[in-house]
Every structure is written in structure tokens, then in C-alpha cells.
Amino acid sequence: MNRQTSLPEQRQLLIRVSDSNYDENTKLVVTTFYTSSEDANNNNATSSYHNISTHFVNITPDDVCKFFDENPTQSIIFAKGAEPIRHVLIPLFVSNERYVPHQIHQYYDIQHLYYKGGVEDENQMEEEDVDVAAEDDVAIARAIMEMSEETQCVSSSGVSSLLIFESLYFGSQIWVQLSKKIRKESFSPPPPPPLACLHGHPSPYIPVALCQPPSMGVKELPLDGMASIFSNYQPRKKIRAKFILSIFRPNFWSVLNKKANGKIRKKPFLCSSAEAMDFVSANAVIVRMRGLPYDCTDTQIRAFFEPLKLTEKILFITRTDGRPTGNCDAFVQFETEEDAQQGLLKHRQVIGQRYIELFKSTAAEVQQVVKRCNLINSAPVVANAVEVSDEKKKDCVRLRGLPYEATVQHIVNFLGDFANMVKFQGVHMVYNNQGNPSGEAFIQMISEQAAAATASGVHNNFMCVGKKKRYIEVFQSSAEELNLQHLVHQQQQPQAAPQALGFLAHLPPPAPGAQQIWTSYPSPPISPILPGQVTQLIIYGIHLSIGVPELVANFTTPDHTVENSFEVQEVMFTRWPTHLCPGEAILTLRSRAVPTQTAQTSPLSQISQISAYSHHHHPTGLPPNFPLQPILME
């Protein structure tokens, strides 16, 4: 059927990709034809045929730009689907740092001219890898010229779908919204060419209507980061599997499981306070693993330690956003000390392409690492100090940066008018496992509103203790870490034996001036100075690369030893080193002349026993649930 063309004096560009791989070696069949005014009034098909020239070219951005520059308003693109434009033309411009012509943003879809039999015939041809011959482009060009203006409908997958698809694949910050807003962190596209300039939208969330065909969107997104990507453009199922799924790939902080049905599940390694509590509650030997691959699984870890048997619990440590800590990757547990020693012999063996460092660890270190990685609320309250109805209720505040000489009265003066909203016996000083002040305190307020007002009212205010003037950081907190602190403390602190209490009963009473003065805001007693064969050192300026093994090796001499085992902890970091601030640690030196079994572990056990005896005989009496031992803290 010969018909007068509705587009006289227009240069038209027909683009068809010769294969479905869309790689850098892709060749294009470019058919150019020019329709003159005389041809428009001529119904002879032969004359239209002779005005069509077909040739193979390896298209370049300069050629396309020249084509559009010569015909800025009358250039029309006919394409066999949107894929040649999405996967060839636009990446071609971006990779060569050229602007994308605005004419590319609209095109005419002429797939139906290639496949008269419908979608089923196209599927069959794609499965058989049948390509359309170049000679067919001449017939397609003639068919385009014979198309009426009514049938030249712009494809529904025009500007929006083209830019969205390319932006998603090439990694710009544009995301799809179906029924809810989606966090950018839920996805991890591969490193992009700079295609973000196409949409130029500053917002991280962009509402987008799904397009047909092809349509693409997020079907569902639960809180665990699972999403289903679907496309109803069945003729391009191979391209969909290659390109749509490629935008979700394993990166440095997540593991993606790609399934055949298009569902993609992201499983970041996260840790909560409940998991940490459950982990340290087991009576097992803990080993720390450092340097794990970013996509390491528990199966690989168990295979690494074979034939040794691990417990069922493996604790992976990451930050709340899924990024690895860069310092400690996982904790594992062995049932016996012998298995742990055999497992440590695998130090610096490899998993995949990375060598793994192994260190013996403790429950206290697990708690410190979890706290340092902000995986639980950084506001531990004194364990079992008061009855807590809701651990997640943020009715506490945490004070950090206190002078070591600070007392409860200093804290009360620091709070000022906010001290009226402190619960009875609600100020709790925090001590490390050597019984020394850690520079932190936790305060229970009467309500969440009071805690929020206190945190915002006195945050970064200065506290003066003697000649020292330090600013104090104040954060709103909850009691969620309460049980974890108490559990770790119970494992590290030796319980007072009945015979020890009987011995203490014959001790002379302390001097009146040395007795603990209990105020309305009592706090665990400060460690007294007791004679013994232990010497404690405070080490400042610890570099980021220095750990517990290096400190133990550096301070071990023929006359002194530093023991850091599962039973005895004599190296304790009070501040972990970072890139911005050096670390601090407290180290306990022992004389080799004193046997280990008779040596004084620390003044901590004596403090607990004396405090319990004094509390029992105190005339005023205290609530039975008030802790009378220092809190274990980093």
C-alpha cells in the first residue's frame, strides 16, 4: 500500500542493534533516508525506495551529534525497542563525556514492523538467536515512510522510563517509588559513568510512575532490605536478567542472593544487643576473627576451622548501616579451651583471597565492640539498679567525658535545675574492670521527656572539678543495654565466697573518715588504695595499629608479666584508638616473684566484699537491688 508520507523533508534515523550483548564491540545498523517534498507528493513506491540508503556503521557520538545538529527540529528516531537507546546511545555519549541530545529522549517504537506475528514470534526468534537481516531495514524504512501520522505514536516508555532505567543501571541517585519511599541505602548499584546529570533532581527520593512497555519497579521492600524487581516486557527477558539484576550486586558491605524469579534479597550482617547477650551468655571460649571477606558466611567460617567444632553461635559485627567495622569482623565460640588453642593455630590462614587474624577474646571485648560499633543504644544503665518495666524506654541520660575525680555531687551540680527530675538513687558512676572510674555516668530520669530535656539542656556544658574544666557530652539513653552490662560483669567478677565474708567479718571497722557517704544519689564506691603486688599503668597515645597482643608483648619483662587470658584480664582499653584520636588503656603489671594463683588479681573483689559487708551493717539501709560493685565498662 502506497501512501503519502506525513513527514516530508525530514531526516530520520533508524537504529537497530545487531546482537543482544550490548558490549563495547556492538555494531549498529543505521539506516538513513531523506524524504523530499517531491517524494511526498509522489505515490510511486520505487522513487521512495531509491531515496533510501542503508549501510553498516560503527556509530560515534560525533556522528550522532552532527546528525542532530544539522536537523535540530526535524530529527526523528525510530528504534527497535528502547534498548538500543538505553544501552548503546546514552552510554556512548556519557562515556565520551558528550552531552545527550534532547532528540534521544523521544523515539518511535517500530518493533511491530519486525514481528508481525506478535510477542510469541519475537520470543521464539530471540531464543533461537535469529537476527534480522540488514536488507530488512530497507523494508522497515519504507514502512515507516508509509505510516500515517495517527499510527506514529510515541512509545509509552519515553523520557521518564528511559532516564529512570539508565539512571538505575548506571548508578545515579534516582530511585523508584511504587507505594512507599525507598531508602537509598537499600540498593547498591555498580560504579557509574556520570549519568546523574540527565535527571538533575536533587532529592534522594523521586516518585516515578511505572511505564509500559517496559515497566520496572520495586514490588515490595520489607525492613530487611528485600525487594522484587519485575518487568512485564517479556520480549527482552534476556536483557532484563542481565541488566536489571546487575544493578544489585554484592558490594563491600552486603551479600545479595539472586534468584531466577527476579527476587533479590540483601542480607547484611547486623548485630543487636539481644544477639550479643545471647552470644556471651554461653559458657564457651571466645575467639575473635579479623579480616574476613566482605561476603563471608557462617558456612565458610565453619569450614575454615574444620575439623574443630564451633558452637551454634557466630556473631558477625558491622555498623548499623551495614558497613564493616574494619577492626573486628566476627566472634566465634569453642566449647573447650583445647579446641580454642587448636583454632588459634590457624592464625593468618586464608578464607578466599584474604588472610584471617585470630585472637583470643572475652565477653567484655564482645560488649565493647558491639558498643563501639553503635549496634546497641550507647547508654548502659547500672544493671538491676531499679526495676525496669520497659528497656527500650529512653528515660535515661549518659554522661561522657567526666573527670576521673568527679563525684555524684559534681554531677548533681552539673545538672543544675534538671537534677530535680532525677529518680531516687538514679545517678550511677561507671567503673572499668580494674575498679577505676571510666569517665562515664548514667542517670535515670523520671520520664522520657525529662531525659530529652536534660540531654539537650546540658550537652557540651563544662564541669569544673578542682582546677580541671572539661566539657561533658550528654546523650539520651534507654535501659536496653542494662542486661548486657550486668551479664558481662557477672562473668568477669568473682563472687564473694562465704568463707571470704567470714574472714571479712573479723576485719577491724574502717575509720569514720574513710566510710562511704551515701547521698540521695548513691553510687558504687570508688576503689580504695590497697597494698599488693600489682602495679597499674595508664597508657596514653596508643596508635590505631596497636592492640592487646602488642601491649602485652611490649610490657612483658623478665621481672614483670602481663597476663591476658580468658580467666584474667589485665589489659583494658578505656578509649579505643581511631584515626582522629589516640587510644588509652589501663595495664596491670605483676611481679614474677609472686605465684599467679596467690597473686592479687585486682582490688575489685575486695571492694565488692567490703562494700557488701558495709551495706549489710549500714544503719540507714539501701534497697536490696542496688548494686554494690563497680560496673564493668570499657
From Swiss-Prot:
Main location: nucleus
MF (Gene Ontology): mRNA binding
GO cellular component: nucleoplasm; ribonucleoprotein complex
SMART domains attached to this UniProt entry: RRM (SM00360)
Subcellular location: Nucleus
Every RRM domain range: 285-363, 395-479
Keyword line: mRNA processing, mRNA splicing, Nucleus, Repeat, RNA-binding
GO biological process, one term: regulation of RNA splicing
Pfam families (alphabetical): RRM_1
Top-level taxonomic group: Eukaryota
Classification via PANTHER family: HETEROGENEOUS NUCLEAR RIBONUCLEOPROTEIN-RELATED
Family, as annotated: Belongs to the ESRP family.
Cited function: mRNA splicing factor that regulates alternative splicing of many genes in embryo. Probably plays a role in the formation of embryo-specific isoforms.
Protein's recorded name: RNA-binding protein sym-2
